[in-house]
Amino acid sequence: MAAKIRREDEVIVLTGKDKGKRGKVTQVLIAKGKVIVEGINQVKKHQKPVPALGQAGGIVTKEAPIDVSNVALFNSATGKADRVGFRIEDGKKVRFFKSTGELVK
């Protein structure tokens, strides 16, 4: 099955502490149905030092995965979150915005 949200897409968070925020998808975890969005859903992780690798210990801030159902693709034409559909054009499967019918770039 084709993914409606892909890496490098700009998305808006629909629910949770970061509701309404926009960011770029950096990673899609297909098996878990989650995405990692740049600058969104940041958590603090306590990390032990690893002297063999030269890593210092401390508290590290990183992005945690968000369920794909809690984000929507950002439509720059309308300035809002939008749903995505698929259709066949010239023998290729392409994504389009359901509200405007425009192709997703």
UniProtKB/Swiss-Prot annotation:
Cross-referenced SUPFAM superfamilies? Translation proteins SH3-like domain
Q: Does the keyword Ribosomal protein apply?
A: yes
Its subunit composition reads: Part of the 50S ribosomal subunit.
Organism for this UniProt entry: Aeromonas hydrophila subsp. hydrophila (strain ATCC 7966 / DSM 30187 / BCRC 13018 / CCUG 14551 / JCM 1027 / KCTC 2358 / NCIMB 9240 / NCTC 8049)
- What is one process in the GO biological process aspect for this record? translation
Instruction: Give the intrachain disulfide bonds.
Output: none
Describe the function of this protein: One of two assembly initiator proteins, it binds directly to the 5'-end of the 23S rRNA, where it nucleates assembly of the 50S subunit.
Q: Where are the transmembrane segments?
A: none
The name under which this protein is listed is: Large ribosomal subunit protein uL24
Which is one GO molecular function term here?
rRNA binding
One Pfam family cited in the UniProt record for this chain = KOW
Q: Cellular component GO terms, alphabetically?
A: ribonucleoprotein complex; ribosome
Query: Keywords for this entry?
Result: Ribonucleoprotein, Ribosomal protein, RNA-binding, rRNA-binding
